[in-house]
Amino acid sequence: MKKQLNKITPRNIDFSQWYTDIVLNTKLASYGPVKGTMIFRPYGYRIWELIQKYLDEEFKKVNVDNVYFPLLIPESLFNKEKDHIDGFSPEIATVTRVGQKQLEENLFIRPTSEVLMMDYFSNEINSYRDLPLIYNQWCNVMRWEKTTRPFLRTSEFLWQEGHTVHSSYNEAENFCLKILNIYEKFAKEILLLPVICGKKTEKEKFAGAKDTYTIESLMFDGQALQCGTSHFFADNFTKVYDIKFQNKENKLEHAYSTSWGVSTRLIGALIMTHSDDNGLVLPSKISPIQVQIIQIKNTEQIDQVVEIIKDKLSDYRIDVDNSDKSFGFKISEAEIKGIPIRIEIGPRDLENNQITISRRDQQENKIKVDYKDIKSVVDQMIKDYDLALYNNALENRKNRTFKANTIEEYIEILKQNQGFVLVPFCGRVECEQDIKTKTLTNSRCIPFDQKEVKAKCFNCKKDTCLQVIFARAY
């Protein structure tokens, strides 16, 4: 296994290769036979299952129902919403024939399901009593990407997409923000990602949306990653798909809709935020294995102690390695998998009723404890471990957050650093396109937690009160 660990390129030499090495060497995923696709291996898929579990529980608290809609969308249906089709047309995969028979109408493989859901809702909704409809589906989607990387940007990926219809503008907008709060809490408390919440600019908002809200995270290398979005459509989609309901005054009125989603790119965010040159470093709540027990020898006494420890730590996901692999191999395997807590049990320690325990982020800091006290020790170590991961990520973000007031200052920062740059920005699409042309960066969000300050746009010098985060992004 040490030989396997040597395959991981150091982070400070080539971050991109380091990331790829982590994905492949930790057996999270493999490349698929079609360019841009990937195979989820068991360990990687278990992380996704835990993401699903946590989010599904939160969704159900706000009355979300799970459904499943078809993979294929008729072209005529998709074409109803011009902004939507324009936003996705370069990425859409199309089915044109079955066997040798040409289809009468092209079928799009879903890049997202707004149009399918809206078409369905138009037939289901008649009265205000039918509302709200709050649906979510866990599924795959396809967007034919030019440049792909496992988890971060693949032509086919897994995600959840929620779609809702409401009887009032305010109710829809509030629900959209409620979902964003769920994403923020999940990112911070489960994934230990110190995300920033905000609204997308006009240029970066979702095609067809009135407003797009986002959680943005900064990776270890200083590039941004969009971790989740919630879109408020107002009545943009419901007018196109003629979704009307009879209100309490018995008048017909267009409904209001939202959509929201996170994807398997969250796994990419975990890797690039927390991991190191020795492999994965996983937050405890999302780690498939939280505690790894390594038996140095297989004896009856050690087997008995292992069972006692497993019973005491029954609240945790535990794996016992009692294989005939070498001790060094077992240690390295636990390390590369990013398992938060490692317990080593050998005959010498047991003479004093002791075991050796360590944290993944502090490999050399091993302590010996009485195995009878293992529950309280692990409880505290897990808390300290998770807090350290979050604080390290937050410190990295603080150290890589800058301010600029002019395009010249902005370009100078980019020459020396990667990170979030807060700038006064006018918000115009044309201005942002000019910035992207000049710098290959774009806006990440208009943060919620900002005071209104009059200033000049850092690029075009027009008056503005907006402070916007710009960065290079995955």
UniProtKB/Swiss-Prot annotation:
Molecular-function GO terms, alphabetical: ATP binding; proline-tRNA ligase activity
Residues in a coiled coil are: none
The entry assigns this protein to a family as follows:
Belongs to the class-II aminoacyl-tRNA synthetase family. ProS type 3 subfamily.
Could you give the subunit structure recorded for this chain? Homodimer.
Subcellular localization: Cytoplasm
Q: Please state what the protein is called.
A: Proline--tRNA ligase
Q: Does the keyword Transferase apply?
A: no
Q: EC number(s) for this protein?
A: 6.1.1.15
Pfam families noted in UniProt: HGTP_anticodon, ProRS-C_1, tRNA-synt_2b
> Which Gene Ontology CC terms are recorded?
aminoacyl-tRNA synthetase multienzyme complex; cytoplasm
Q: Which PROSITE patterns match?
A: AA_TRNA_LIGASE_II
Keyword line: Aminoacyl-tRNA synthetase, ATP-binding, Cytoplasm, Ligase, Nucleotide-binding, Protein biosynthesis
Q: What does this protein do?
A: Catalyzes the attachment of proline to tRNA(Pro) in a two-step reaction: proline is first activated by ATP to form Pro-AMP and then transferred to the acceptor end of tRNA(Pro).
Choose any GO biological process term that the UniProt entry carries and state it. prolyl-tRNA aminoacylation
Do you know which InterPro entries this protein is assigned to? aa-tRNA-synt_IIb (IPR002314), aa-tRNA-synth_II (IPR006195), aa-tRNA-synth_II/BPL/LPL (IPR045864), Anticodon-bd (IPR004154), Anticodon-bd_dom_sf (IPR036621), Pro-tRNA-ligase_IIa (IPR002316), Pro-tRNA-ligase_IIa_arc-type (IPR004499), Pro-tRNA_ligase_II_C (IPR016061)
Its encoding gene is what?
A: proS
Chemical reaction(s) catalysed: tRNA(Pro) + L-proline + ATP = L-prolyl-tRNA(Pro) + AMP + diphosphate
CDD domains attached to this UniProt entry? ProRS_core_arch_euk
Q: Does the keyword Mitochondrion apply?
A: no
Query: What's written under domain?
Result: Consists of three domains: the N-terminal catalytic domain, the anticodon-binding domain and the C-terminal extension.
Taxonomic source organism:
Mycoplasma capricolum subsp. capricolum (strain California kid / ATCC 27343 / NCTC 10154)
Which Gene3D superfamilies does the protein's record reference? Answer: Anticodon-binding domain, Bira Bifunctional Protein, Domain 2, C-terminal domain of ProRS
